[in-house]
Structures are given as C-alpha cells and as structure tokens.
C-alpha cells in the first residue's frame, strides 16, 4: 500500500479471513500515489514500483522474499509522477516500466535489462497531463501495445507496438472528450 504521508510503502499481511495486519513500512522516496507489484528481476520475489506524486520521481523497491523490501531506488522524471505500470513491452521476457508525469506532460518508458536494472528508453508526450498508461495487446499479435490517458485534455491515445524488441510505437487512435484517470485490461 502506498501512503503519501509519511512517504511509505507499507506491507500488510493477509490473515486468510479477509483481514490484514501491518507488517512493515519503508520510505518510497517521495510520497507514493500509486504502486504496482511484479517480479522485476526474475528472482521469484515480488518487487514494487511506485509513482511518487509528491516529487519528480518513481521508485523501485526490491522484495526480499520474506515480506520486506529493500530501500527505494528512484528514477527522476519531469514532475508529479502520478501513475506506474509494468508490462513486457519489448517481448524479452521481463517487465518494463512506464511512469506517467502529470505536471511534466508525458509518459516515460524504462526498459528492463532482465536483472531489474532499468534504463530510460523513450518518452511519449501528452497534450496536457500524462495521467495513466495501460499496456495491453490491442491488435492480438502477441506483443503489448499502449493506451495513454491524458486527464486534463480528456483524451485517450492508442499506440501500436510495431517492432517488438525494438520498441517502435505507431499512433493508431486518439479520442477526445473523455475523462480517464485509470484503466485495466486482462
């Protein structure tokens, strides 16, 4: 769970009866607005990504496998990281990271090298505010495409992944007059 104040990722343990108990908390590096969990480094442990809306960064926190996390490693963006998501966008078997910057009017894509080390790959610009990104297979070709949501401009933009591992995206659709903060896909 991301908690903006006091800037923590908190781990809650399920008791099996629908209730949870606090297990641990660790600083997220800037006030988390959204967290997404996935195995970022292929070690079988769940790791956490955080969009730190109180700062100009996103954070990666590696799971230790015992319900605790290692300290946050932050990646800077323009401002107001508002959402985070994961998906194997380059088809190499690991999770890549996309981070939306509300104030920076963009979405930044970070490619995973397979060991959980992320490098900036490319940027998609928003008309007004990058509010959410959703990786999903738009065209049923087996690779992940992107839906980008711009809450202030009321638009949804669909990008088709044209080259798999080379991460070349083609604009395919943009719809205006929609208010969208978040979405999910199977």
Where in the sequence are the language-model features?
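Beta-propeller blade termini
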Residues: 33-42, 82-89, 131-140
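Hydrophobic beta-strand segments that make up the repeating blades of beta-propeller
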Residues: 1-3, 48-52, 97-101, 146-149
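Acidic carboxylate motifs that coordinate Ca2+ or other divalent cations, activating on Asp/Glu
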Residues: 43, 92, 96, 141, ...
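A short loop-to-beta-strand structural motif that recurs across blades of beta-propeller domains
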Residues: 8-12, 57-61, 106-110, 155-160
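Blade-level signature of beta-propeller repeat domains, shared across WD40, Kelch, NHL, RCC1
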Residues: 131-167
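Blade-edge motifs of beta-propeller repeat domains
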Residues: 13-30, 62-79, 111-128, 160-166
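Short, solvent-exposed loop/turn segments at conserved positions within beta-propeller repeat blades
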Residues: 4-7, 53-56, 102-105, 151-153
């Amino acid at each position: 769970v991301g908690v903006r104040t006091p800037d923590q990722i908190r781990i809650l343990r399920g008791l099996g009866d629908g209730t949870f108990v606090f297990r641990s908390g660790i600083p997220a590096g800037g006030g988390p607005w959204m967290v997404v969990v996935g195995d970022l480094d292929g070690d079988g442990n769940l790791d956490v990504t955080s969009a730190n809306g109180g700062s100009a960064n996103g954070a990666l926190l590696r799971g230790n496998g015992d319900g605790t996390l290692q300290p946050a490693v932050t990646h800077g963006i323009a401002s107001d990281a508002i959402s985070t998501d994961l998906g194997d966008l380059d088809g190499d078997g690991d999770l890549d990271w996309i981070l939306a910057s509300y104030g920076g009017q963009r979405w930044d894509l970070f490619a995973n090298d397979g060991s959980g080390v992320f490098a900036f790959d490319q940027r998609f610009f928003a008309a007004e505010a990058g509010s959410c990104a959703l990786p999903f297979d738009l065209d049923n070709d087996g690779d992940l495409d992107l839906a980008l949501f711009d809450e202030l401009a009321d638009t949804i933009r669909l990008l088709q992944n044209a080259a798999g591992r080379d991460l070349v995206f083609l604009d395919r659709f943009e719809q205006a007059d929609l208010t969208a903060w978040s979405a999910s896909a199977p």
